[in-house]
From Swiss-Prot:
One Gene Ontology CC term in the entry: host cell nucleus
GO biological process terms, semicolon-separated: regulation of DNA-templated transcription
Start and end residues of each stretch annotated as Disordered: 57-82
Gene name tied to this protein: UL117
Protein family membership: Belongs to the herpesviridae U84 family.
Protein name: Protein UL117
Pfam families: Herpes_IE2_3
Length: 424
């Protein structure tokens, strides 16, 4: 299913779906094209992660389109540009520098009729339709950017953070917040101060210099400031409060108590990762994912590469020539390895004699995180994707004998390790 607006495009036909292919990469058919026909002179192709590789745009015909509305009953010029194939996921506005050269080609497609400027065959037409092509593109991009900003600003905020640096220790103000959130924040601050043993003023006033920051975050470099995470007033359960004697107070959000559905399905994976990270450092724990489908593996890899502070090593599994061991070799190996003190006695030079190797059709990926939280986020993302195709993926957790961490992750690792959770 492809999500397109019915006002702008009509799906003509699409090729069959590509799924679970174990063929070699050079013989696997991955090219899936969907053919669309625009309706109003331009076509928006939103990136929505569908299983489509290319989009083919064809000229509109009377048979492929529904009857036009009254405002669209105009004579269409006999312009039929050639068929063009564009990569699926190309949107009207691309912010990447590598697509700057293609922007003029991928924004507006004049297929149904010339919607801009003068008519190529009737130069006498003028008026609002005689707008310059570049001027129209500029105004169109500006309008799309403005709608994007308005959509981002109108999204409801799930939580707010109030930093009260100018207030005495333990006093939290509720000024600058909405009426509902202000009353809830005052009650939460009073509960936190009561637990910390700090007196609370009767009517705390927020100074003019106080700021409200969204989204909530804890500054690991200076976490001794009083910081409160406010939850919606409709939260059923009271938030958990942690304090270390009044120096810092952290109130956990109430929605962190409810795990998604896939957490119960892969409970053993989360529990094993948590157990290993309690016993060992995060640099010694690594996540291993195997997949039997190349397309699903690439989708998981693309999703993981959008996470922060992770390292990913991915590739296809190779198998060498299979050769059984002789009974004498098996007996010798087991005899020397029964006693740990005789392990070095059985070491002999190894001569590689395999004459062939080939791909097994299994794809493997190793994921490491800069901190324990980053590794746990990677496990959570993998579980949410693996849940959709459980017969394709396999998750494994490995413990390394020697710590492994990328050099750019060392500052973040040191800050995360030096942070101490306040004791209640």
């Amino acid at each position: 299913m492809v999500m397109f607006s019915q006002d702008h495009v009509q799906i003509v036909y699409g090729s069959t779906r590509i799924c679970k292919s174990l063929a070699p990469a050079n013989k696997r058919k991955t090219h899936r094209t969907i053919v669309v026909a625009p309706r109003r002179g331009f076509l928006r192709i939103p990136p929505d992660g569908q299983d489509v590789n290319h989009v083919k745009i064809v000229p509109t015909t009377s048979s492929s389109l529904a009857p036009p509305r009254d405002d669209e009953r105009r004579p269409t010029p006999p312009l039929r540009p050639p068929l063009t194939v564009y990569p699926y996921g190309t949107s009207l506005i691309r912010r990447s520098a590598r697509d700057a050269k293609l922007r003029s080609k991928l924004i507006v497609f004049h297929i149904t009729r010339p919607a801009l400027g003068q008519h190529p065959q009737n130069p006498g037409i003028s008026g609002p339709a005689a707008m310059d092509h570049s001027e129209f593109l500029t105004s169109f991009r500006r309008e799309v950017d403005r709608q994007t900003v308005l959509t981002a600003e109108s999204a409801p905020a799930t939580a707010e953070v109030c930093l009260g640096d100018a207030l005495p220790g333990g006093v939290m103000g509720g000024g600058g917040l909405p009426a509902g959130v202000g009353s809830a924040s005052a009650a939460v601050a009073a509960a936190a101060a009561a637990v910390a043993g700090v007196p609370v003023a009767a009517n705390p006033v927020m100074p003019a210099t106080a700021t409200v920051t969204t989204p909530p975050m804890i500054d690991l470099t200076s976490h001794h400031r009083p910081l409160t995470l406010f939850t919606p007033a409709s939260a059923a359960a009271a938030p958990a409060v942690a304090t270390n004697g009044g120096n810092a107070t952290y109130i956990l959000p109430a929605d962190c108590r409810y795990a998604p559905l896939f957490a119960s399905k892969y409970k053993y994976v989360f529990e094993e990762v948590s157990r290993l990270m309690r016993l060992h450092d995060s640099t010694a724990v690594q996540l291993q994912i195997s997949a039997s489908c190349g397309n699903a593996f690439q989708a998981l890899k693309s999703a993981l590469l959008k996470l922060h502070n992770v390292t990913v090593l991915a590739g296809q599994q190779l198998i060498t020539q299979t050769m059984p061991h002789t009974p004498q070799a098996v007996a010798t190996f087991k005899f020397f390895h029964q006693d740990p003190n005789r392990v070095l006695d059985c070491i002999r030079p190894v001569v590689p004699r395999s004459t062939s190797y080939h791909e097994t059709g299994v794809y493997q990926m190793w994921v490491s995180g800069a901190t324990k939280k980053d590794l746990f986020d990677a496990v959570t993302l993998c579980a949410s994707i693996v849940e959709k195709q459980p017969d394709v993926f396999n998750i494994n957790v490995s413990l390394l004998t020697y710590p492994s961490i990328a050099a750019p992750h060392l500052p973040l690792y040191n800050e995360f390790t030096s942070f101490r959770l306040p004791t209640s």
